[in-house]
A protein has these predicted regions:
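Tryptophan-anchored aromatic micro-motifs
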Residues: 22-36, 51, 100, 143-145
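Central antiparallel beta-sheet cores of small beta-barrel/beta-sandwich binding domains
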Residues: 41-113
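A mature extracytoplasmic/lumenal domain signature
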Residues: 42-44, 51-53, 118, 129-131, ...
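Short, surface-exposed coil-to-beta transition loops
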Residues: 34-37, 84, 109-114, 136-140
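Bacterial Sec-dependent N-terminal signal peptides
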Residues: 1-21
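Short, compact, well-ordered microdomains
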Residues: 123-126, 140
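Short beta-strand segments that buttress and anchor functional surface loops
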Residues: 29-31, 99-106, 127-130
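Edge beta-strand at a domain terminus
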Residues: 131-149
Length: 149
C-alpha cells in the first residue's frame, strides 16, 4: 500500500512538473534584433504570440508600421503592433519542445511552420521556422525573456 501511494504521489508530481514545464514558454520576449517584444500565452491548449511593443525607431510618421508585405492585400493596412505572429504551438513532453506551430515574418510577409525549445536556461527561447515539413531547410532565431516595461 505504501508503495502504491508513493507511486501515485510521484505520478501526480511528475504530471504537475511537466505541465509547469509546458507553460515555461509563456511571458514577454525580445526578438533577436531587440526591436519588438512578443507576448506568448496559452490559448485553448496551444501557445500563441503577438507583438506587444515596438521600439519607436520602427514607427513610421509616429505610427507603428503596417503589415505591407502581407500577401493578402486586405491585411496590408493592419498594424504590426498587436499582430499575432506565432500560433498553434503544442508541447511535446518527450522532445521537451513546442511543435506544430506557425510563425509569421512581417518583414517578408511569409508564414513558416515552426517549433521552439530551450537550451538549458528558460531565459533564452529558440525558434526555428521552416518550409512545410522540411525542418533542415529553415532559419533559427533566439528570443530573450524580458518584461513589458
Amino acid at each position: 500500500m505504501k508503495k502504491f501511494l508513493f507511486l501515485l504521489a510521484l505520478g501526480l508530481y511528475l504530471n504537475v512538473a511537466s505541465a509547469q514545464n509546458s507553460k515555461s514558454i509563456t511571458g514577454i520576449w525580445w526578438n533577436e534584433e531587440k526591436t519588438s517584444k512578443i507576448e506568448v500565452v496559452e490559448q485553448n491548449g496551444k501557445y500563441v504570440g503577438k507583438i506587444v511593443y515596438m521600439i519607436p525607431e520602427k514607427y513610421e510618421n509616429g505610427q507603428p508600421p503596417k503589415d505591407t508585405k502581407n500577401p493578402e492585400e486586405s491585411l496590408q493596412n493592419r498594424s504590426i503592433l498587436g499582430l499575432q505572429i506565432l500560433d498553434g504551438l503544442t508541447f511535446n513532453l518527450d522532445e521537451k519542445q513546442w511543435e506544430e506551430g506557425h510563425i509569421y515574418d512581417p518583414k517578408s510577409g511569409k508564414t513558416y511552420d515552426c517549433y521552439a525549445w530551450f537550451d538549458g536556461s528558460t531565459d533564452k527561447l529558440y525558434l526555428k521556422g521552416y518550409v512545410v515539413g522540411i525542418k533542415w531547410l529553415g532559419k533559427s532565431t533566439e528570443w530573450t525573456r524580458t518584461s513589458l516595461n
